[in-house]
Swiss-Prot record:
A GO biological-process term: heme biosynthetic process
Organism of derivation: Staphylococcus epidermidis (strain ATCC 12228 / FDA PCI 1200)
Keyword line: Cytoplasm, Heme biosynthesis, Iron, Lyase, Metal-binding, Porphyrin biosynthesis
Entry GO terms, CC: cytoplasm
Catalytic activity entry: Fe-coproporphyrin III + 2 H(+) = coproporphyrin III + Fe(2+)
The family this protein is said to belong to: Belongs to the ferrochelatase family.
Enzyme class, UniProt record, top EC level: lyase
Annotated binding of Fe-coproporphyrin III, by residue: Y12, R29, R45, Y46, S53, Y124
Cell location: Cytoplasm
Major localization class: cytoplasm
Enzyme Commission number, as recorded: 4.99.1.9
Job description of the protein: Involved in coproporphyrin-dependent heme b biosynthesis. Catalyzes the insertion of ferrous iron into coproporphyrin III to form Fe-coproporphyrin III.
Protein name per its UniProtKB record: Coproporphyrin III ferrochelatase
Keyword Lipoprotein: no
Organism taxonomic ancestry: Bacteria, Bacillati, Bacillota, Bacilli, Bacillales
Amino acid sequence: MTKTIGLLVMAYGTPYKESDIEPYYTDIRRGKKPTEEELQDLKDRYEFIGGLSPLAGTTDRQAEALLEALNKEQDDVNFKLYIGLKHISPYIEEAVEQMHNDGIKEAVTVVLAPHYSSFSVGSYDQRAQEKADEYGIQLTHIKHYYQQPKFIKYWTEKINETLEQIPNQEHDETVLVVSAHSLPKGLIERNNDPYPHELHETAEILKQESNIIHVAEGWQSEGNTGTPWLGPDVQDLTRDLYKEHQFKHFIYTPVGFVCEHLEVLYDNDYECKVVCDDIGVNYYRPEMPNTHPLFIGAIVDEIQSHI
């Protein structure tokens, strides 16, 4: 008899329409409403990338692709999909409640973020767990999947494809900037959080597996909290790398993200490119994983190792 297990795919969430922007931003700021200036700044960023972020649709497609791939691999288990978002409906708690209403007793949770931090993935897991405990649902949490061979293979292929656009004799004048979303430094240090190490390990593996010669690690998209965040910021890093090594070609791989959204389309494709244009170097940013079979396969492999 086939057993039904819940598959709770969790993600950050993004506004679906312009009127969602203020409540969404307020939720991110833990109930503190943004000023008119802050709200307009966010609206301007969305406008710059062509309206609202494509994240919502991509999250749905990634979750559906993951469900399909998992169910193809299983004969005795049937996964049922639930999507839970951090900052907009359907919230994580709503997804767990729906599981309960559907009679789900057991579920696997996965966050659409490849590296673990107690501040990010850990907070998603905690919210899901607290709600699941109310209903007696047993959850298996997938912590990370950056180390999965298919995840590494995806990025290795993209790096090598990008290098092919650069003359061979200029590969030594090319640098790969590997980045993830910055987080508050104090919080990371207090918790002895593995997040910076996991990004470093990713960068090291990509250097070993790809044809790139020079690799640098950076952080991006930090919040405006008035406290130190993990650095160096990718824009500062770009200027420093150029100043120290005179690299001609900069390849940006924001491996902490899994699709094209505001942080990639604006913070990389606009802000980093502005810096590259300013110092007179070439900007490259390979396509993000989105629903690529290697990326989906990496998550499938990680889930299968836990069930």
